[in-house]
Amino acid sequence: MSMPATSTKTTKLATSLIDEYALLGWRAMLTEVNLSPKPGLVDRINCGAHKDMALEDFHRSALAIQGWLPRFIEFGACSAEMAPEAVLHGLRPIGMACEGDMFRATAGVNTHKGSIFSLGLLCAAIGRLLQLNQPVTPTTVCSTAASFCRGLTDRELRTNNSQLTAGQRLYQQLGLTGARGEAEAGYPLVINHALPHYLTLLDQGLDPELALLDTLLLLMAINGDTNVASRGGEGGLRWLQREAQTLLQKGGIRTPADLDYLRQFDRECIERNLSPGGSADLLILTWFLAQI
């Protein structure tokens, strides 16, 4: 399909550099979905609490999305002289077109809608920073993405109307701001918690997969995951957070033997129909930012 126009301004970014970041985004999505075992989530072992999707759907989806990540980077570069609050409006048509390709690749299954939003924001932030010759670090990328989203929670979650979206309902009932709130705040769960935790475990010599699984547990323990709350309500969310915190307090995932705890957690999540998809999206960002 034809790609939406991004800007009439040209960028000075090398295609090879743009493609390098886009490849990292694709690898981040594949790293997350292939990570196993993950409680309630699709992985190499089972489909978690999802009856409508399989591992291959995520592989096809990630490939479809990879083709659009350069467009987000290019728009971020082309719009570098715009006020940051104006950038999100221009990103939306790119995101919608990317989402359309995702649904075509998966025959209508929503595999990575959250990642299109979050990776799209981070890629646009990278493009802006590169164009302005500013350092590209996890902190600068996330703070730039936050500047794009200024006022987003107020505009989209606090609006009163008769037809509440799922996000608006969870915000009004439980105060959860979900992906919008995390983006507007500059991804503090990633920058302040998941990323330093993951990097510390790697520095200690822990196997990278075990380090990622332990980091997923950390995210599940502290994230007000709207995916979980939409399936299990406040009770389901609090249960999942407590279980993840309990595993962390017992020592977390440090050896292959600890995977038995995750397998049991997975079975319990499936029985309760709970899937921490929001935490999975944040794990994708954690791995992505760890590479830059």
Swiss-Prot record:
It comes from the Bacteria. The keyword Secreted does not apply. It catalyses: 3'-dephospho-CoA + ATP = 2'-(5''-triphospho-alpha-D-ribosyl)-3'-dephospho-CoA + adenine. Keywords: ATP-binding, Nucleotide-binding, Transferase. Induction: Repressed by H-NS. Part of the citCDEFXG operon. Coiled coil: none annotated. One of its GO terms (molecular function) is ATP binding. Its EC number is 2.4.2.52. One of its GO terms (biological process) is prosthetic group biosynthetic process. It holds the Pfam family CitG. It is an enzyme of class 2 (transferase). The keyword Magnesium does not apply. HAMAP family: CitG. Belongs to the CitG/MdcB family. Catalyzes the formation of 2-(5''-triphosphoribosyl)-3'-dephosphocoenzyme-A, the precursor of the prosthetic group of the holo-acyl carrier protein (gamma chain) of citrate lyase, from ATP and dephospho-CoA. This is 2-(5''-triphosphoribosyl)-3'-dephosphocoenzyme-A synthase. It comes from Escherichia coli (strain K12). The lineage of its organism: Bacteria, Pseudomonadati, Pseudomonadota, Gammaproteobacteria, Enterobacterales. The gene is citG.
